[in-house]
């Protein structure tokens, strides 16, 4: 019989990352840079989202050799991505002992109808969301941590801002509702009624919600924290910059001290050029990774 972790334990692991930065890395060297810069965790990948976007084709789980290399290189938690709905990729990563699995729209979905039943796993999961409906559906499936979808690999923060603001606005709306209005709101959002009741009672989501997708500068990271993010994922931004080590430290500092504008100004000096970035309106519908999943 497969073991499963309790929600309390899995969500507690996510709470421990609160206020921190999680960085995408593709090898042991990058993982060490991230750890030394103060990252609370790393995401082991074969290619960062910008390279996945540029290469096209089918993006799958990283080679286990890369994941193991990163796990052996650092003492901080290691996450890895599995395709949406790909049961075996997730089980393989769990068997390898990763600390967290990201059921990620950055990779090509394996199942366009069903997400993983994350309640059946011992390892905790993080999932992306654009609104409260997506957020609560993923939580009901067993996600222990959420993140904005943003638009990965673009270096453009606009979609992450949109998603964070939308989720938080919808949470505030639910909190202000009377109990007899909640069932209709659950129907409108496609959200489990019991979770909306819990959100109304607690005044917040039952799991942490990080910012992800388009964080490219220290100011971007600070912006997302001000908008209510519990922490920040940085994908392509750090290792696509001119000075990754300095850039990584600046992102971590800006995330921690997100209202210290003089410090953020100093952190932003002489970082070199940030990743070039992509204007969202130039993307074709099929290039929009955030549309993957439901």
Curated annotation (Swiss-Prot):
UniProt: D-glyceraldehyde 3-phosphate binding residues = 165
Q: Name one GO biological process term.
A: pyridoxine biosynthetic process
Keywords from UniProt, A to Z, are: Lyase, Pyridoxal phosphate, Schiff base
Q: Tell me the GO molecular function terms.
A: pyridoxal 5'-phosphate synthase (glutamine hydrolysing) activity
Q: Please state the Enzyme Commission number of this protein.
A: 4.3.3.6
Q: Which InterPro entries match?
A: Aldolase_TIM (IPR013785), PdxS/SNZ (IPR001852), PdxS/SNZ_N (IPR033755), RibuloseP-bd_barrel (IPR011060)
Q: What class of enzyme is it?
A: lyase
* Residues given in the record as D-ribose 5-phosphate binding sites: 24, 153, 214, 235-236
Protein origin, superkingdom: Bacteria
Pathway, per record = Cofactor biosynthesis; pyridoxal 5'-phosphate biosynthesis
Task: Please tell me whether the keyword Membrane is annotated for this protein.
Answer: no
Q: Record's SUPFAM superfamilies? A: Ribulose-phoshate binding barrel
Coiled-coil region(s): none
Oxidoreductase is among the record's keywords = no
One Pfam family assigned to this protein is: SOR_SNZ
What are the catalytic residues? Answer: 81 (schiff-base intermediate with d-ribose 5-phosphate)
Q: Which reaction does it catalyse?
A: aldehydo-D-ribose 5-phosphate + D-glyceraldehyde 3-phosphate + L-glutamine = pyridoxal 5'-phosphate + L-glutamate + phosphate + 3 H2O + H(+)
Instruction: Spell out where the chain crosses the membrane.
Output: none
Assembly state and interactors?
A: In the presence of PdxT, forms a dodecamer of heterodimers.
Record-stated family: Belongs to the PdxS/SNZ family.
State its role. Answer: Catalyzes the formation of pyridoxal 5'-phosphate from ribose 5-phosphate (RBP), glyceraldehyde 3-phosphate (G3P) and ammonia. The ammonia is provided by the PdxT subunit. Can also use ribulose 5-phosphate and dihydroxyacetone phosphate as substrates, resulting from enzyme-catalyzed isomerization of RBP and G3P, respectively.
Q: What is the protein named?
A: Pyridoxal 5'-phosphate synthase subunit PdxS
Q: Per the UniProt entry, what species is this protein from, by scientific name?
A: Bacillus velezensis (strain DSM 23117 / BGSC 10A6 / LMG 26770 / FZB42) (Bacillus amyloliquefaciens subsp. plantarum)
Read off the lineage from the record. Answer: Bacteria, Bacillati, Bacillota, Bacilli, Bacillales
Q: Give the gene name.
A: pdxS
């Amino acid at each position: 019989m497969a073991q499963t972790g309790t929600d309390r334990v899995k969500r507690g692991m996510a709470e421990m990352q609160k206020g921190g930065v999680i960085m995408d890395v593709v090898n042991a060297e990058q993982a060490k840079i991230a750890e030394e810069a103060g990252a609370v965790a790393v995401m082991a990948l074969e290619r960062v989202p910008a390279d996945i976007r540029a290469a096209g084709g089918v993006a799958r789980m990283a080679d286990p050799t890369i994941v193991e290399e990163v796990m052996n290189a650092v003492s901080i938690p290691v996450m890895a991505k599995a395709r949406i709905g790909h049961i075996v990729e997730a089980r393989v990563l769990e068997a390898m002992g990763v600390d967290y699995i990201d059921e990620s729209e950055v990779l090509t979905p394996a199942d366009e109808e069903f997400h993983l039943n994350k309640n059946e796993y011992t390892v905790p999961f993080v999932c992306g969301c654009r609104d409260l409906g997506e957020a609560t559906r993923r939580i009901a499936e067993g996600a222990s941590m959420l993140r904005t979808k943003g638009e990965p690999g673009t270096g453009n923060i606009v979609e992450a801002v949109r998603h964070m603001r939308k989720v938080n606005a919808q949470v505030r709306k639910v909190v202000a509702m009377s109990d007899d209005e909640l069932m209709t709101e659950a129907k409108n959002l496609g959200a489990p009624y019991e979770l909306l009741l819990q959100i109304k009672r607690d005044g917040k989501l039952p799991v942490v919600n990080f910012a992800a997708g388009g964080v490219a500068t220290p100011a971007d990271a600070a912006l997302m924290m001000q908008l209510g993010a519990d922490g920040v994922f940085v994908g392509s931004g750090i290792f696509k910059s001119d000075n990754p080590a300095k850039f990584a430290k600046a992102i971590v500092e800006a995330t921690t001290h997100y209202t210290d504008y003089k410090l953020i100004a100093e952190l932003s000096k002489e970082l070199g050029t940030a990743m070039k970035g992509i204007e969202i309106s130039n993307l074709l519908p099929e290039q929009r990774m955030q549309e993957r999943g439901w």
